[in-house]
Curated annotation (Swiss-Prot):
GO molecular-function term, one example from the UniProt record: rRNA binding
Naturally occurring in which organism (per UniProt): Shewanella frigidimarina (strain NCIMB 400)
InterPro entries: Ribosomal_uL4, Ribosomal_uL4-like, Ribosomal_uL4_dom_sf
Keywords, alphabetical: Ribonucleoprotein, Ribosomal protein, RNA-binding, rRNA-binding
Name assigned to this protein: Large ribosomal subunit protein uL4
Gene Ontology terms: cellular component: ribonucleoprotein complex; ribosome
Region (Disordered): 45-72
Complexes and interactors: Part of the 50S ribosomal subunit.
Gene that produces this protein: rplD
Pfam families: Ribosomal_L4
Family the UniProt entry places it in: Belongs to the universal ribosomal protein uL4 family.
Keyword RNA-binding in annotation: yes
Function in brief: One of the primary rRNA binding proteins, this protein initially binds near the 5'-end of the 23S rRNA. It is important during the early stages of 50S assembly. It makes multiple contacts with different domains of the 23S rRNA in the assembled 50S subunit and ribosome.
GO biological process terms, semicolon-separated: translation
Length: 201
């Protein structure tokens, strides 16, 4: 299959297994959920009534004071007491096989092509790290909410995009499924397309 280059009167021959396969929604969902879960720290921790510091002595006698009965100063209803269902540190990570991860990325790229949200260009960059220059360039291409994917990290492009809302720059190695589906349009250079094919082969 072929992908038309937006800035040139030519097309790029690409693999149908990478850019023309059926969309596997269940697989993409599983990989995206796993990716988000793997980003969680899981380091929060609270103390139960058994773990907080405090005396084990009964605060006052059971009967005769007129006050509500109390057996411990560490109970959850007391200030400084333990938490009823205390959060504990836990590992939220989910294992995703390489084959599944690659399959999900192929599915996403294929769906982007089908929905005409993948824009391929011969090359893309800015001469200086100027946000104004990049904004004008994107406006000329009628692009706003866009992920720019290049073969290698372009520092000028990265710095120019840093202060633009809904614009991000990644190299092929830094791609992830969440970023690919988060933007309306994905702008990819021809060199990056070849790298993507090699990575997902």
């Amino acid at each position: 299959m072929e992908l038309v280059l937006k800035d040139a009167q030519s097309a790029l021959e690409v693999s149908e297994t990478t850019f023309g396969r059926d969309f596997n929604e269940a697989l993409v969902h599983q990989v995206v959920v796993a990716y988000a879960a793997n980003a969680r720290q899981g380091t929060r921790a609270q103390k139960t009534r058994a773990e907080v510091t405090g005396s084990g002595k009964k605060p006052w006698r059971q009967k005769g004071t007129g006050r509500a009965r109390a057996g411990s100063v560490k109970g959850p209803i007391w200030r400084g007491g333990g938490v009823t269902f205390a959060a504990k540190t836990q590992d939220h990570s989910q294992k995703v096989n390489k084959k599944m991860y690659r399959g999900a990325l192929k599915s996403i790229f294929s769906e982007l092509v089908r929905q005409e949200r993948l824009v391929v260009v011969e090359s893309f960059g800015v001469e200086a790290p100027k946000t104004k220059e990049l904004k004008a360039k994107l406006k000329a291409m009628n692009l706003e909410d866009v992920l720019i994917v290049t073969a290698e990290v372009d520092e000028n492009l990265f710095l120019a995009a840093r202060n633009l809302y809904k614009v991000d720059v990644r190299d092929v190695a830094g791609l992830d499924p969440v970023s690919l589906i988060a933007f309306n349009t994905v702008l990819v250079t021809a060199d990056a397309v070849k790298q993507i094919e090699e990575m997902l082969a």
